[in-house]
Amino acid sequence: MSTETVKIETIGSGGDGVAATNEGAVFVPFTLPGETVAIARVKNHGTVMSWSETSPERVAPRCRHFGPEGKGGACGGCQLQHWADGPYHEYKRQLVVAALKAKGIETDVAPLFACQPGERRRVTMSLKLTDKGIVLGYMQAGTHHIVPVEECPIAMPAIVDKLPVIRKLGQVLGSGSQPFRVTVQATLSGLDIAFMDLRKPDARKRQTAIDLCLREKGLARLTLGDEILIEPEKPVVDFGGVMVSPPPGAFLQATMRAEQAMADLVLGHLKGAKRVVDLFAGCGTFSLRLARQSAVHAVEFDAPALGALDL
């Protein structure tokens, strides 16, 4: 490890600040273009020790778990909460511009469709049993450390409000010292909670988890892998007026507004098309909307997702 002072020139595609040095580029998380920082360097990775010049585009992060000063560690769920919206949005747009240009495609790229705090309806978190109880949160980048979260400002309140319940379920169903995961989706009928990477719990643990779900309002389904443990309400999402029940852990667009914006774009471009093939159709995000104006052939490798289209 060495120490040096560097000037951040840009933000790389992975979200880290990039500085040029005599030994090549070094990537420094939680920095911004124009900032001068003293870093501890290991190969091409730098950790900020202090700032001697900060960017006027730097803002206070919304989340108490974000960044090197984050509570419980630097949560790996977000990378750029410290950047003002305007330059951040343009950075994301330029990623698309660069990707197209690399393939020889020159075209206009629209401004970023910005999602707001509290809109994300789908999160995947990690859990681990410890001597002190259960830890629920996101992995710190480049480590196996789970940052225990008390809040998640990007997620819908329906998810954040149930974090204590998800912890309890993890405490009941978990075993051993290996981490496991949970995907939580907010649906119209309640939360769809899907645990993964778990050993099969015994009958007592299953019943305890079921009883907990029955006592809690707002829980639609609890699954272990592909096994439905309890389903008080069938999880339902709205794809353009068609109600669909996705399988456990199914892919959904992160926010409903972004999904609608994408669907409007697709529908507009394909208006007048008699036949459409929807590759990687998932649960029908686009297929079911397109079916109102065209004959659609939906293609999807995941059988449970495709089964959700069988209305």
Regions found by a protein language model. Give the residues of each.
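Terminal RNA-binding accessory module
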Residues: 1-71
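Short beta-strand micro-motifs enriched in acidic
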Residues: 40-42, 126-130, 185-187
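Carbohydrate-binding surface patches
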Residues: 184-198
